[in-house]
Amino acid sequence: MLIVLEGLDGAGKSTQVELVRRMFAQEGVESHFLHFPRFDAPVYGELIARFLRGELGAVDKVDPYLVALLFAGDRADAAAQLRCWLDAGHAVVLDRYVYSNVGFQCAKLPAGDRQEELRRWILDLEFGYYGIPRPDVSLFLDVPFAFTEKKLSEVREGDDRDYLKGERDIHEASLDLQRRVRGVYR
């Protein structure tokens, strides 16, 4: 079973993923976890980190199709591992997946036809061309925006922040983008 948790930055996805994994452990179900993007992954991990640090341009200046390719490539590289776990009958829990790509990249375009074209393109690229596994369950953690705002205004620390090398994540730094992403998800 492939379970995906999606949501805005700071929505509590990692907390919920850990609770789901504990539940599986208590039930004796072998489970695996991945967080996307995988900053330690060769090629795509470092490119995504550079993008999120702002080294490739401002959040509204880098073509969302190119950014979508980076995030999709990371998942395509992980697809064989996901299939291996799933084929073995294990539960797989993911913190972000394809719909994060749709949400964040489409939010960079005006609402309407251009967003819809990009949405279709990302879904076709990831599930069609790359053939990555489709989730059995995909949950969007729709928390009040004030919660996200508060979480993103706090200092965020931990090993999972190493990719920033002291910089701010350009997606997290833009509350306007986060609002638009929420609109795309909904």
Name each model feature, range by range:
Residues 29-133:
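ATP-dependent small-molecule kinase phosphotransfer cores
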Residues 101-183:
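A glycine- and Lys/Arg-enriched "phosphate-lid" helix/loop adjacent to the NTP-binding pocket
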Residues 19, 43-50, 143, 147, ...:
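Generic alpha-helical secondary structure signal
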Residues 20, 24-25:
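Hydrophobic alpha-helical packing residues
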Residues 3-5:
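Hydrophobic anchor at the beta1->P-loop junction of P-loop NTPases
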Residues 10:
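Walker A (P-loop) phosphate-binding loop of P-loop NTPases
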Residues 13:
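Conserved lysine of the Walker
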Residues 16:
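Hydrophobic positions on the alpha1 helix immediately C-terminal to the Walker A/P-loop
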